[in-house]
Amino acid sequence: MNKRNFIATGASLAAVALLAAGCTTTGGASGDPAAQRQAIDAAADSALSRLYAQAAGSRELVASSRGMLVFPNFVSAGFVVGGASGQGVMRKGGKSTTYHRMTEGSVGFLAGAQSQAVFILFMTDDALKRFEASTGWTAGVDGSVTLLTVGADARVTTLTGQQPVIGFVLTNSGLMASA
């Protein structure tokens, strides 16, 4: 295979992977916005139950947050060029208030697909207000996010809650390799 065909094939595979990632974010909900919100809420409830079961202390941390974004099905896919997307909900005091979409792009050595649940907790009123006032919030630019990995016997401590914005990621399924 010559270099030109290899690059064209790689680009085609990357485009298909990105298209597949975009097509799987709706979770089977119909085109009806109310049905989509209901599906996102149900998936968020399920993801929160998993978080509470896997990370001791997470329920208390969520309860003390000023607001929380839950992206129950954040799907990543790629082959050299990758992308990720998911729909989520902002919750305040346990109630769904607004609905959001999160996207991500990456370039590098990667191949595969993976689904994750992403939780972003706003621990201060100021951090939440900055998010709500933005028209395209970017982690690291509009706010720094302390990312916590949740694995076996994960425990959330009181030190965790001292950061203004905290993120949790739970793997749902799939395998993603990167370098």
Regions found by a protein language model. Name each.
Residues M1-N2, R66:
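Poly-acidic low-complexity segments
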Residues N2-A11:
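Bacterial N-terminal signal peptides that target proteins for export
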Residues G10-L13, L61:
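Alpha-helical transmembrane segments
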Residues A20-G22:
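C-terminal motif of bacterial Sec signal peptides marking the signal peptidase cleavage site
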Residues T24-A179:
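Small-residue-enriched, tightly packed secondary-structure blocks
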